[in-house]
A protein has these predicted regions:
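Terminal-proximal interaction/regulatory segments of ATP-powered molecular machines
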Residues: 1-122
């Protein structure tokens, strides 16, 4: 089934190429759409194009490793609270409780407070 092959290419693009080739996912998704719209036999060109590009791409398992680490931490600490400075403060009560206190947008500077709950930081 050509859709199954194209679907596996989409998964491979993130799972095995990931950040080493940021264009791989876009190509794989475009290939999947082409297979759906064009159909066989012409979609073979799209499948071969994508297969060759994915095979030639540098590979990285960084996304898989980081995702698995994040899932393991979430399972280990299922009830860790969101740090107060990251919580939305739409009411005066929430502001008085310290929600969103000291929050600064991350871009352009080092964030001294961090984003992880205290118990996870210690792990």
């Amino acid at each position: 089934d050509p859709k199954f092959i194209a679907r596996r290419m989409v998964i491979f693009a993130s799972e095995d190429i990931g950040l080493a080739g940021n264009g791989a996912l876009s190509l794989a998704v475009a290939t999947f759409e082409a297979v759906e719209r064009v159909g066989l036999p012409e979609a073979r060109y799209n499948l071969f194009h994508c297969a060759i590009a994915l095979a030639r791409s540098q590979k990285s398992r960084e996304i898989t490793d980081l995702m698995n680490d994040a899932i393991a931490l979430a399972r280990k600490y299922p009830n860790s609270p969101v740090p107060l400075h990251l919580r939305n403060a739409p009411t005066k009560l929430m502001k008085d409780l310290g929600y969103n206190k000291g929050y600064k947008w991350q871009a352009g500077f080092q964030h001294e407070k961090g984003f992880l709950p205290e118990d996870i930081k210690k792990d």
